[in-house]
Amino acid sequence: MVSIIIPHWNGVDVLSECLESLKKTRYSDYEIIVVDNASTDNSVEWIKKDHSDIILVQNDKNYGYAGGCNRGAKVANGDYLVFLNNDTIQDQDWLAPLVRRMNSDSNIVAIQPKILNYFQRDLFDYAGGTGGHMDILCFPFTRGRMFLNQEVDKGQYDTAETCFWASGTAMMVRKDSFKMANGFDEIFFAHMEEIDLCWRFHAMGLDIWSEPESVVFHKNAVSMPMYSHQKYYLNHRNAQLMLLGNYSLLLALYLGFIRFILELIACVYAMVKLDWNHVTGIIRAFWWLLFHPHQIWQKRKRFKKLREVKDNDLSLIHISEPTRPLYISYAVFCLK
């Protein structure tokens, strides 16, 4: 069985379209779990009335994407879990290719579909594309999207491949491995928690794949606006939290210092543009990291217990010397 877990906070209209699409899925053995993160609208009442066949988990507060998914996983009956954003719709045949790919190799622990833009359906989605990668300074990008540039889907990525991370927009994982890796780290709340999870999977010697035969469409930035203070804060904080928490100590300190300098440059650049949401997001991220060393250290200890693969053996992207200045400048000035 496949358990489809949808964390949700407000927006009945968004969730309604997602559920109507899901129920057209051409795959018989699945269940739908909606985890309500203490919505303040009529989401819970609507689900109980119009979708009584769905498993509903009601949280006492908003635990974010990470916490919502973890609580959904606890009640899941399937051997495979699919974590799915509520602002997605799915191709009718989206689920079977993911299951087939997962069944093909016991070392595959997570897999994502091809994720396209909901509003312009020949365009790769910002949040997922066809599989995520990350450079050594923890700047993430995807096949189909480099920073702010999204490619048109012309079939150029229609081959299933390994990747560094699967997008939390729509990702399938093995339930037993998810539990072994301790699930999503709830410190993240939202944004990059799936990258952190996939990093742990890699450290355990497991593989992440992208399966473009499966297609999902994503609206993006419905629950949190693209240029909001909170989004900036979580992106900047969580990238540095991963870097400091997951690398070996000396490498974390070395790369952490370089990333800190780049963050300062990004902050100054945002000041020049009078982009105060971005400025305050970066400063708030620094503030959190400065005053939570214990939580960072505890994260390092948890990661170390799982590690079977050294840093040098991880499939992180190393940018070549000739293109590095251009790449770094683009990463800093376009960082969202």
Regions found by a protein language model. Give the residues of each.
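Short, acidic, metal-binding catalytic loop of nucleotide-sugar glycosyltransferases
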Residues: 20-29
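Glycine-rich, basic loop-to-helix element that forms the pyrophosphate-binding segment
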Residues: 59-76, 86, 97
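Short aromatic/hydrophobic "clamp" motif used to bind/position activated sugar donors
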Residues: 81
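A short, conserved alpha-helix in the catalytic core of glycosyltransferases
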Residues: 158-217
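Active-site-adjacent helix/loop segment of glycosyltransferases
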Residues: 204-309
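Single conserved hydrophobic/aromatic residue that forms the stacking wall/gate
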Residues: 317-336
